[in-house]
Amino acid sequence: MGVLSRVDTPEDVRRLNVAELRELAEEIREFLVRKVAATGGHLGPNLGVVELTIALHRVFDSPADPLIFDTGHQAYVHKILTGRKDRFDDLRKQGGLSGYPSRAESPHDWVESSHASAALSYADGLAKAFALGGQDRHVVAVVGDGALTGGMCWEALNNIAAAPDRPVVVVVNDNGRSYAPTIGGLADRLTALRTQPAYEHALDAGKRLLKSIPRVGESAYSMVHAVKAGIKDAVSPQELFSDLGLKYVGPVDGHDVVAMESALRRAKDFGGPVVVHAVTQKGRGYEHAENHVADQMHACDPIDPLTGRPLGGAKARGWTSVFSEELIEHARRRSDIVAITAAMPGPTGLSAFGERFPDRMFDVGIAEQHAMASAAGLALGGMHPVVAIYSTFLNRAFDQLLMDVALLKQPVTVVLDRAGITGPDGASHNGMWDLSLLGIIPGIRVAAPRDAATLREELGEALAVTDGPTVLRFPKGSVAEDLTAVERIDGVDVLRAADPESAVRTQRGDVLIVAVGPFARIGLAAAELLAPEGVSVTVVDPRWVLPVSDTVVKLAENYRLVVTLEDSGLHGGIGSTVSARLRSVGLDVPTRDLGVPQQFLDHASRDQVLEQLGLTPTDVARRIAGWLDAR
């Protein structure tokens, strides 16, 4: 019987000897490869935090001592050690285990952490709350070195450092080796010494003694302090943290469970804010992840665990790759086109752009706010920036888009990948908020391509705009074959006419479906289901969904019912915008909006979520028929 089979709680982990801990780490890696290969998920990051997480659960008393994982996709090992290993067969599946910490799953999960750079702020607030309540509890935040490129981390660290007696332990999971490990007895000795409370008392006493010497005391103290600081900074990469007033332990080999536990115990015993710097290897212990050049299998679909290759053969062409190729074509012809990403060049399709135009590609780190304001500066300087981010991360850059780009009428194109329902990553990653946010920005123009052809077309149109921001949004996954319009009227594509024999501009019918982006396919399928019932339906794709086209308004006059269909939130979405526009011109035609309710939706596949929401062709046709009957 293996060690892992005997571990269901942190208490079980604390009972193990060193040999068993090392065996446990290897068994966990084998478990992760086997399970994530079957379901897909974040494999590389979790292979890199096995020993680190084991040590955390041996030193701290979770859940009394909160363990908060920044970018919570690195919490799989935490889930295994807190009684959830038997649920990994359903990881990221409907009704199954979340791919992120989940308060609904376990008291060991304090937050639903998934967006980067927030863990330290959670930790700061929790530590303050415990102090105010007189509770003697430690708070631990595990933050990846990538997340430290986000300014929010440093805002939090500044506040954490302001309370030297508040027990917050910040574990920097450095899996990119952006800090060089320090080797040698002097560094080890200084690390141990600096975090002993007796050392702090001695420092205070020495400081008082030196400063009390008449005339030379202050200078003597300054000289000794400078020598001490110089030695520390020469032997370990800590100045970023020590200059804030934070104690520093490390660098520590994050794959040596004994060393990791020892470092964490020293940090815990200190009793104040401490940074523990753990150097880890992403993808550790799985050859195909270690050798995966792009990102050490950061996230993967189901794979063959023996070869590391995706199951099911080659993937169909994706939206992201179409965007990537088209942007490069435009950039070849125009030297003013530059690209910006917030630490995600691969997932947003900008890696190839960066290889082709290295001087025109800017990865700003996990800093969407800065990305947008920097784009405004580039535009002011004569460039046309393209900011490519996930739709869900637009929330972070909204103020800059509103006040630094739109207010100044700067030509910045924002490309929102993973718009709409994304599925397995759950509530935090569904891109369902963007249209509600964008709809309140004066002068903004938003396109929603329905296929590869319209994505290429609309990207070109966006890059031609010189007097304000433009936005393109498209979903996750593969792009289906192109849908050809039967007619284009002033930029609006008619995909199906209620009466194919008469002019679309003047014909009358029962229903006008205004379908946004890929939902055009649902609209067309619903129209075909309604046709045998004698319901005449015209389906249009406005292409540019904001502002609402005059053509949509004119067409609406000729129908008994206008139905909008969108892969985004209903409140403030395209449906409500179309309805408001029709009312503003005094058009009294009934409207109905079909889209995503303003709810936090649990993880499941995209198709499962759409079925659950009644956004399938059958459901749409049934609801339209019911609305017509009610009239």
Swiss-Prot record:
It holds the Pfam family DXP_synthase_N. Mg(2+) binds at D145, N175. Thiamine diphosphate binds at H73, S114, H115, A116, G146, A147, N175, Y286, E368. Binds 1 Mg(2+) ion per subunit. GO terms for molecular function: 1-deoxy-D-xylulose-5-phosphate synthase activity; magnesium ion binding; thiamine pyrophosphate binding. SMART domains: Transket_pyr (SM00861). Keywords: Isoprene biosynthesis, Magnesium, Metal-binding, Thiamine biosynthesis, Thiamine pyrophosphate, Transferase. GO terms for cellular component: cytosol. GO terms for biological process: 1-deoxy-D-xylulose 5-phosphate biosynthetic process; isopentenyl diphosphate biosynthetic process, methylerythritol 4-phosphate pathway; terpenoid biosynthetic process; thiamine biosynthetic process. It catalyses: D-glyceraldehyde 3-phosphate + pyruvate + H(+) = 1-deoxy-D-xylulose 5-phosphate + CO2. Its cofactor is Mg(2+); thiamine diphosphate. Its EC number is 2.2.1.7. Pathway: Metabolic intermediate biosynthesis; 1-deoxy-D-xylulose 5-phosphate biosynthesis; 1-deoxy-D-xylulose 5-phosphate from D-glyceraldehyde 3-phosphate and pyruvate: step 1/1. It is an enzyme of class 2 (transferase). SUPFAM superfamilies: Thiamin diphosphate-binding fold (THDP-binding), TK C-terminal domain-like. Coiled coil: none annotated. Catalyzes the acyloin condensation reaction between C atoms 2 and 3 of pyruvate and glyceraldehyde 3-phosphate to yield 1-deoxy-D-xylulose-5-phosphate (DXP). Belongs to the transketolase family. DXPS subfamily. Homodimer. This is 1-deoxy-D-xylulose-5-phosphate synthase. It comes from Nocardia farcinica (strain IFM 10152). The lineage of its organism: Bacteria, Bacillati, Actinomycetota, Actinomycetes, Mycobacteriales.
